[in-house]
Structure formats: C-alpha cells, structure tokens
Amino acid sequence: MRIAIATGPFHPTPPGPAGAVERLTTDLAARFAARGHEVTLISRRHPGLPDQEVAAGVRHLRLQGSQSTSRVWVNILKDFPYSLSAARRLPAADVWLLNSFWLPFLAARRRRDAGARIVVAAHRYPKGQYRLYRGVDRITAVSRSVADAIVTQAPWSRPIVNVIPNPIDTSVFTAAPRDFNGPLRFLYAGRIHPEKGLEILIRGFAKAAPCLPGSTLVIMGAWEVAQGGAGPAYVEHLRTLAGTAPVTFRDPVFERTTFAAALRACDVFVYPSVAEQGESFGVAPLEAMATGAVPVVSALGCFSDFLQDGVTGAVFDHRSPAASENLAGLLVRLGTAPDLLKALSAAGAARARDFGTDLLADRHLADYAALLAG
C-alpha cells in the first residue's frame, strides 16, 4: 500500500522534541515501511532536521509549523495554515492517515484527485470538529472513551469509528527488577499544567510522606507554554505547595531511551490527570507499566482500556472533594505492601506487552486493507 501520514503543527517528529503522538506515529510509519509499504510522513519543520529525507524507509516532508499557546481557540486557528499546506503536499496514496484539526476537512476536498481513503487518527478528545469530517472513510480512536465522545458529538460517524489503542515500543520500554522494600521512588512525567492534577499529587504526597520515610517524588515535564506547560509561575506555585516535602522538579526528557531509564528508576508512577475532556489514552502510564513501575492514575475512563484497578495498577477518585486525601491513603497502602506492589508490577508489565508497536501496526494495516477491499 501507499500510505501518507500527517501529524500536527506544534511538535516535530523524532529526533526533535516530539510529543507522544509524534513519537508513536513515527514508530508506526517505520513499521509500515518495514512491511514493504510506501510511506510518506508529513510533520512540523524543526531546526537541525532536513525538510526532506528518507529515514527507516520512510519519506519525510517537514513543513512550517507554529508554537502552541495556552488558548485552545488560538491553537485551532494556528492549525489552519499548516493543515492547508499539508493538504496540498499530500501525495497520491491508498490511505491518508491524518492527525491535525483542519486537515481531514481540507483533504476531503481533493481526495478524488489522489484516490486515497481518509483515516482520521483520533489521538485527542474531540472538540466538535468531527461534524466537519463527513468526507472521511474511517475514524480510529485511541480509546473507547474518545470513540464514545466522537459518536456523541457526531452521531453520523458511528459506522466508521473503531478503536485501536496507542502503541508503545516494548523493545525500549522493558521491565527492570524492583525490590519495593524500603523507601519508594514516586514519579510523575508529563506536562506541568493544572489539568494534570499536580496540586492533588503534591498535597497527597505531602500527607503520605511522613508514613513513608525516605520516599521521594520527582515531577518531570515540560513547563514552558510553547510545549504545553503552564509557565514558570505555575512551577513556583507547585514548589511552594510542596513545602518541605521531598519533591524534586526536573526538565522534560524527550530522548526515548533516557526516558525509559527514568521510568525504570522509579517504583510507582503517578498520573493524576483531571482533564475530563483532554485526556485521551495515557501513553506515559502504559510505558511506565511496561518497565515494571506500578501506575497510579485518576479515575478518567480512558485509562481503563489498559489498567485494571487492583490488578495492573491502582486508581483513585480524583473527582472527590477529598481527592488529595484519597491519593495519600492509596500511596500509603501501596508503600507499606511490597508484595502487592510486586504483583501489580508483574501483571502490569505483562499487560503492557499487548500494546507493542508491531502488534498494533498490523491491526492498522489490516483495517486499511479492509477499507480498500470495501
């Protein structure tokens, strides 16, 4: 097959400072190419990366992008010129796999010339745009909660919506042995933003810390607004909130093997997101599971696609007025039960292997073949 893929305007693909979506999309593109398909990947231009190259069998085209802002409506406007440029550069293909706000709408206008089937990669919670996508052939959501939201907003789409979860590179995110006795190393990795529930996390850890002597919490992630963070003032607010609790802040890690090493160096990975209409899947908790870290997540529905409370991880009620207290109690229970942590770690690592890039690349390709046959 000839497959053309386009990511969004705000982050480059690796080896640039890619987001999770750009990273996993690049992985899928390489797997498609390795299976003999002709693959083109359109992404944002980045200093030090050529505008055109072939890498891992994938033809890369890089276009002028934009800096993201803290305002959703501004980002939607900024997406338009990039999507217009990408729509003009999409090559003739059997499948166009598109992940940008305006691009599916614009691409549908020229599909007759290119003869492509249009697949929308629904990596993010919908913002009403699916009403514009009547010309597409498939909408592939990364979680059941995203699929349900799309159908709610655009009921016409129900017959063409399916779910294929985000993949992780299980050759990089490999499990490491842990003792779980003694002080524990807690880690959050993600954007430093209020919607990630970090105030709940810091308050909860500060309450739990006296019962877990020697245990530490590291908060690692992008804080700059251009990278999706909330800016330096919010980081200082979190530092003040932490007080004397053993909490350390670190800059984001974009290089994959270094990030995997950071996950292997922690015991418990906490991802307390409160983004009811922002969280779509949760790649970071799944990658943490793959390394043997025990994931602790909020009760957002998207996490249930890979995490079962008490079996492969733990869930706390982030919607409760006592969310910090709920989290603190859970951290103490886990921190004083090493055998439970060992069981959760083993089950989580085994479950994460079901999300390997090779397995999910084959699911995508089978779906494309079915579209073309139909």
Region locations from a protein language model:
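A short, well-ordered alpha-helix in the C-terminal region of glycosyltransferases
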Residues: 333, 339-354, 366
